[in-house]
Amino acid sequence: EDFKTDMDCAVSIERRIAAMKQVYAAGIRTVCFVSPVFPGLTDFEAIFARVKNQCDLFWLENLNLRGGFKKTIMDYIAVKHPGLRPLYNQIYNRHDRSYFEALMRQAEAMARQYDCPFVDNEMPYGRVPQGHPIIVNYFYHEEIRGSENTGARHKKEDK
């Protein structure tokens, strides 16, 4: 909650989860969009445990740092979470994808553990059995932009 407050002025996480539960109970398809996943800070498995019985889709998107926003976040990490500076340097200055590749494998394993579908850049519609939301990988947004959620990615080697 403290981290959320540092990042935005929206209502509390508890209020968001309570609202999601009410909407889900009313029969409306719900999505838990975990975005951005901050390396070393966002525990998406803990979030999943809290919401899996009240959402149909569980989206994951990594933190993308572009433009002036990069300096703002890197400065925030340096001040508030200095122990994470090497990790953020590895990811955002050295362009090492291994952290998020490992998180993707972790999300796939979580999907298997909870018998949930795992899709890459897709937008499935409809309700799912309670407790088995579809886990959607939206890591590396720059690769999926313009793909219309078809599952296609535009990797550097594809260009």
Pin down the residues of each PLM region.
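Conserved AdoMet/S-adenosylmethionine-binding subsite of the radical SAM
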Residues: 1-106
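C-terminal accessory extensions appended to soluble enzyme cores
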Residues: 70-159
